[in-house]
């Protein structure tokens, strides 16, 4: 209760106030400074740390190129000749990226002057897209090799902290979500010295030691046919990797939680989820894709679009796989997210089925003031959207005599308007 804590909000981190904040952190003896993920990048990194990572990435790129040249020289039939022009362009890109970072830093006070001795990152999986070099080609499951600016910035901060014997703590429930390479990145963040001691700084060396490429048939992006895929998807030497991981990880399992509090995780009704299946309308079927006699799918459908995107590089403004899957998610929820003017048909609407289910549960439990939690991943109001105002109506006495199902239908109809981004526009207060 007596801790001296600074909570940074968006007003403190504006360009006008930023320098004041940096001085405030540097010149006060705070026990903790709490800052949002989105603001962390605005805390400058030491120039020597940035220069050091720049040189390391250049050396890594050169090493990978030399390995590719040697592999081609030893076995030209099995290995592709490395593209020297592409290699030089990569070096230029790395230099340009770090020069831009240094220029953006300006003359701000950096974290080395702020007295930071412990960095604790909640939801650390949001920083998993750390850039890396690899000579592995046409291998799925490697993750995002380009990385993100957010991850690179955090990596710069962890490098500074490691070099100065400071502390780092990551908190996450999903250390590995999409790719085995995320374990490698976690080790780069938290135990870089352990990787160096074992000669595993390069991803390729780490992957050969702890991973395995599996060849198998997989559904293509359209989910209509199979293709052979080489995927980095299997751990090897699990015992050795587990020992490295447990050297820095404090693992809390669901069983551990239940030992301390047997009722912490509520029991699922019926011991398993209840799947509510809603029939697909003709509009949704056409939008997803209907097979034609020639084996193709109707023009403009999701499957048709995904087949056309297969194997193509994403270009700005053009259709891509992510856009297709986003549209597929929208139409799977409610066709009105695709066509706001479409008529709501009860038997084909998941949102209607959900609302009806929630209302039925309400009728069963309202006498004991039962509580429900509803989760929906699409078409939810954002902070900048219209606010919903719930007030006790003047005619409260009349509500007792109304038909609850009719009211539910009217409520659903009133929520049938969406903005251009597919977000629900709440009914006005009037």
Where are these regions (language model features)?
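Conserved helicase motor "Helicase C" RecA-like lobe of SF1/SF2 P-loop NTPases
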Residues: 379-430
């Amino acid at each position: 209760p007596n801790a001296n804590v600074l909570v940074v909000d968006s007003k403190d981190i504006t360009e006008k106030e930023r320098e004041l904040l940096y001085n405030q952190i540097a010149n006060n003896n705070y026990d903790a400074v709490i800052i949002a993920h989105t603001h962390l990048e605005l805390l400058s990194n030491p120039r020597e740390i940035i220069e050091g990572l720049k040189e390391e990435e250049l050396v890594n790129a050169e090493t990978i190129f030399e390995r590719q040249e040697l592999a081609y020289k030893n076995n030209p039939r099995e290995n592709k000749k490395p593209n020297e022009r592409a290699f030089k362009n990569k070096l230029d890109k790395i230099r340009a990226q770090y020069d831009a970072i240094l220029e953006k830093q300006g003359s701000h006070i950096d974290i080395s002057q702020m007295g930071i001795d412990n960095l604790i990152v909640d939801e650390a999986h949001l920083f998993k897209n750390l850039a890396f070099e690899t000579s592995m080609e046409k291998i799925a499951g490697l993750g995002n090799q380009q990385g993100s600016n957010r991850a690179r910035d955090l990596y710069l901060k962890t490098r500074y902290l490691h070099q100065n014997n400071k502390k780092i703590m990551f908190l996450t429930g999903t250390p590995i979500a999409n790719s085995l390479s995320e374990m490698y990145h976690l080790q780069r963040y938290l135990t870089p010295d352990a990787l160096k001691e074992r000669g595993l700084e390069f991803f390729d060396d780490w992957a050969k030691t702890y991973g395995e490429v599996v060849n198998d048939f997989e559904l293509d992006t359209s989910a209509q046919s199979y293709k052979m895929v080489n995927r980095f998807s299997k751990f090897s030497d699990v015992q050795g990797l587990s020992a490295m991981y447990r050297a820095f990880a404090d693992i809390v399992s669901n069983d551990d939680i239940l030992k301390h509090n047997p009722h912490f995780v509520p029991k699922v009704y019926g011991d398993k989820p209840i799947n509510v299946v809603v029939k697909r309308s003709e509009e949704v079927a056409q939008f997803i894709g209907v097979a034609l006699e020639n084996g193709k799918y109707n023009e403009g459908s999701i499957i048709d679009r995904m087949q056309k995107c297969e194997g193509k590089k994403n270009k700005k403004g053009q259709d891509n796989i992510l856009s297709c899957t986003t549209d597929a998610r929208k139409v799977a929820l409610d066709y009105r997210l695709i066509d706001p003017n479409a008529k709501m048909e009860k038997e084909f609407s998941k949102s209607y089925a959900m609302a009806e289910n929630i209302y039925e549960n309400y009728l069963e439990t309202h006498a004991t003031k039962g509580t429900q939690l509803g989760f929906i991943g699409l078409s939810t109001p954002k902070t900048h959207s219209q606010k919903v105002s719930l007030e006790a109506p003047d005619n409260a006495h009349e509500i007792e005599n109304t038909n609850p199902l009719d009211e539910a239908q009217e409520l659903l109809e009133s929520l049938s308007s969406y903005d251009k981004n597919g977000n629900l526009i709440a009914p006005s207060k009037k």
